[in-house]
Amino acid sequence: INLVTEKLAFATDYCGVKSGRDVDKFKEMNLHACDGVNVSCPAIEESPVNVECKVKQVVELGSHHMFIAEVVGVQISDEYMDKTGKFNLNSTGLVAYSHGEYFALGDKLGKFGYSVRKK
């Protein structure tokens, strides 16, 4: 699983609508494959976060399949880590996809427990 940034949104959309049988998506979008660390599956070098998984179960849902997987590794580009070694979501420009639309992520809404803190 390669997380998507705003810079990669166009390439992500292209890769989602084009078939790998018809076009070399990496070449067309100038993407580069890199070796996985814990799995024998390539990752996208330009992605700031690569999540490596092993498929445990495939559930057939009629129109599509749902994959249940175990996360066996996570690689994060150093530029997205803060000084304490934590992932800095604000600096990544990550994108989410929902119901055919892309959304920018990253605005901090609060810290865990903020809903019950005394004022």
Q: What are these regions, as identified by a protein language model?
A:
Residues 1-119:
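Basic, polyanion-binding surface patches
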